[in-house]
Amino acid sequence: MTFTKKANQVFNQAIDDYHVFDNINTPIKNPFEEGSIENRLYLKCWIDTVQWHFEDIIRDPQIDPVEALALKRRIDKSNQDRTDLVEQIDSYFREVYKDVKVLPDARINTESPAWAVDRLSILALKIYHMKEQVMRPEASEEHKTKCQNKLNVLLEQQIDLSTAIDQLLEDIEAGRKYMKVYKQMKMYNDPSTNPILYNQQK
């Protein structure tokens, strides 16, 4: 089984599990062994799924401002958790390929494998929710047709992205490409780099 076939299966399981209750406060019950890549992939997609629904809720024009601020804080934390998890997944890949002999003419990729996996997780969410739109009983046929066309593109994109990730991993394994990972260095959550926060400490 290719890496992305496994990843897409885990992503779909996480999305389906979330929608059993469809509640942003539902505690996660990760079915995979702690420390396994499946565990990290499931957690990654769970975070993405919860945040997807955060973003829906905060766009409600009738939302209470206090509630919106609290939700924005949760979104900020979710973004940081997501970034941390991507870096954990890259650490997994570095461990897997640590003994690979890199070829003299090896090239670097534009992004690390885990950031491509991040996009694959989001794509699984887009596909799930676009399918919902296609199946909406009260929606017009015009709406369903438009959404079906979009769904077809998303499914094609999923195939292409999955293929690209698997090919990248094959190239890394063969030494034709090498991983170079940079920390994201987000500044807005850091009290020492966000001017609003560090100016309050004066």
Identify what each model region corresponds to.
Residues M1-K202:
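Anionic, Ser/Thr-rich low-complexity intrinsically disordered regions
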